[in-house]
């Protein structure tokens, strides 16, 4: 199916791979996936019923970063095998799953392929020295665009994710792997982002275990995880990370491999097995075919676990959406590192003043509530300060200086599946008046984590192994807060509110500008 056009006008194609019987009911399965993901108006028993009826929807892509040539090649291999094999496992997967397979950057794939083949002698071929960006406007940062949807490729993929298919699992292939290994595969290192549902990292762990188990069962050593590299789940903006804020399981592998053979180097510390590298691999020459086989193994592990836990994945995306709606409908607090630091500081002051000697409020003899790292229960109330509640919504006034940019911001949210309302007349909230046309973004919706992450300040934890030790930086930018980046004027509303609001259908339309004519102009622009 065609899902859009690239920046250079090429067609973006997505293969929909499932059984012939499922193809006859694709519209129904798409509707089930949508209703479960959005969760609004769906009761638990209805969700259970739809989860039993539905099919697991899994997205697998390749080629987003075009010089990471393995991605596009393994994708073609995988599609061929899924439509040609008839073994029992493949047939079960085709019955239980709907695979969405797409090349994420066709422009880049053509550019890199032509550049590589310019050299007539195969041993001399290389993708190095590419003469221009492999995405016309943003190159490598096409994987930092999925919160803003600036590029047509991004917009097309986000439409599949957040408006049409709502996959439960999204697998994004990349290169290259850490030195002395074949690939990095999840699970990821801490921290995960505090806004998204804890079922997201638990779902990642479930799928990741299936991947690593299959590598070992097939005799494919050299897969590392967690501390084996720096990848985390904190940041928004990437193809596989923005999905976390939409209650989806996002996967990343970073694999070695090149059409021209490479060598796995000897890294001594990576020859000692550990929990994050259970099966080291010996230094050796490495061929592209081997990398493709590892990628296919990973793909099939994902599809296999999606098949076996189909109902759980479908119900859990509903559960996460329902949790978000409920949290946005009542007082709720997201606990951040600064809150914990404030509590610890208060506890330390009490200890220093002799509270520990008196047993404080906890009783139990000397040390009382302070024993074993505990603190008096009264300090828990600091974490429930009414002033620190999560917002129930955000109001973007129509009378701000740059309402055109505010409209662009709102449309970026709409492209990522966020429900936006607009005031049909002036209104008041919390004693403040707002004009007609103001935008309203409520947090009582399934994709609440994304709303909060686009508006709220970031508080990435200090990642220091020990006091005075070297800090470990975030994998990517710690904040993708689009409202700050675009200079938006908005108000946080901590209590429930309503007004003359109408849901925006399609995209928001900015008001027409005015041209003022002076009778005695000083000049023209």
Predicted regions located by residue number:
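Short acidic/His/Gly/Ser-rich catalytic and metal-binding motifs that mark active-site loops
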Residues: 109-110, 179-182, 262-264
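Short, solvent-exposed turn/loop segments enriched in Gly/Ser/Thr/Pro and often Arg
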Residues: 6, 101-106, 116, 172-180
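Divalent-metal coordination cores built from histidine and acidic residues
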Residues: 89, 94-144
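Intrinsic-disorder/low-complexity accessory segments
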Residues: 1-97, 138-139, 144-145, 150-152, ...
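Proline-aspartate-enriched helix->loop->beta-strand connector
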Residues: 161-176
């Amino acid at each position: 199916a065609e899902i859009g056009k690239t920046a250079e006008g090429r067609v973006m194609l997505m293969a929909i791979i499932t059984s012939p019987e499922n193809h006859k009911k694709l519209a129904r399965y798409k509707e089930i996936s949508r209703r479960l993901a959005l969760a609004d108006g769906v009761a638990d028993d209805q969700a259970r019923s739809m989860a039993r009826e539905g099919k697991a929807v899994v997205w697998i892509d390749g080629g987003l970063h075009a010089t990471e040539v393995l991605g596009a090649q393994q994708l073609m291999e995988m599609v061929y095998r899924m439509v040609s094999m008839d073994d029992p496992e493949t047939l079960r997967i085709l019955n239980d799953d709907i695979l969405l397979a797409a090349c994420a950057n066709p422009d880049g794939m053509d550019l890199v392929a032509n550049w590589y083949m310019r050299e007539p002698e195969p041993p001399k071929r290389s993708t190095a020295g590419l003469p221009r960006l492999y995405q016309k406007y943003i190159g490598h940062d096409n994987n930092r665009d999925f919160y803003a949807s600036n590029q047509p490729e991004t917009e097309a993929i986000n439409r599949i994710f957040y408006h049409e298919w709502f996959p439960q699992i999204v697998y994004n292939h990349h290169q290259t792997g850490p030195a002395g290994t074949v690939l990095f595969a999840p699970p990821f290192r801490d921290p995960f982002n505090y806004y998204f549902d804890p079922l997201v990292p638990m779902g990642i762990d479930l799928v990741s275990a299936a991947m690593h188990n299959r590598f070992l069962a097939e005799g494919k050593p050299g897969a590392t995880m967690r501390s084996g590299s720096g990848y985390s789940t904190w940041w928004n903006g990437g193809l596989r990370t923005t999905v976390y804020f939409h209650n989806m399981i996002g996967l990343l592998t970073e694999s070695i491999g090149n059409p021209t053979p490479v060598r796995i180097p000897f890294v001594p510390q990576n020859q000692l097995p550990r929990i994050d590298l259970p099966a080291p691999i010996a230094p050796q020459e490495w061929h592209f075919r081997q990398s493709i086989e590892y990628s296919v193994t990973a793909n099939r592990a994902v599809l296999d676990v999606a098949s076996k836990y189909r109902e759980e994945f479908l119900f859990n995306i509903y559960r996460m959406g329902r949790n978000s709606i409920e949290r946005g409908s009542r007082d709720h607090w997201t606990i951040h590192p600064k809150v914990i630091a404030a509590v610890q500081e208060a506890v330390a002051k009490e200890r220093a003043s002799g509270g520990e000697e008196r047993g404080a409020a906890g009783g139990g003899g000397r040390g009382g509530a302070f024993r074993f790292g505990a603190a008096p229960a009264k300090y828990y109330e600091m974490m429930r300060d009414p002033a620190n509640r999560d917002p129930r919504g955000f109001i973007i006034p129509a009378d701000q200086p740059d309402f055109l940019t505010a409209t662009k911001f709102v449309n970026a949210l709409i492209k990522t599946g966020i429900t936006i309302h607009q005031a049909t007349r002036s209104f008041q909230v919390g004693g403040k008046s707002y004009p007609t046309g103001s935008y309203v973004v409520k947090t009582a919706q399934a994709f609440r984590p994304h709303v909060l992450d686009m508006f709220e300040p970031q508080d990435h934890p200090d990642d220091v192994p020990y006091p005075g030790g070297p800090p470990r930086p975030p994998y990517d930018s710690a904040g993708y807060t689009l409202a700050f980046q675009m200079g938006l004027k908005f108000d946080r509303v901590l209590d429930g509110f309503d007004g003359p609001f109408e849901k925006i259908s399609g995209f928001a339309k900015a008001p027409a500008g005015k041209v003022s004519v002076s009778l005695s102009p000083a000049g023209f622009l």
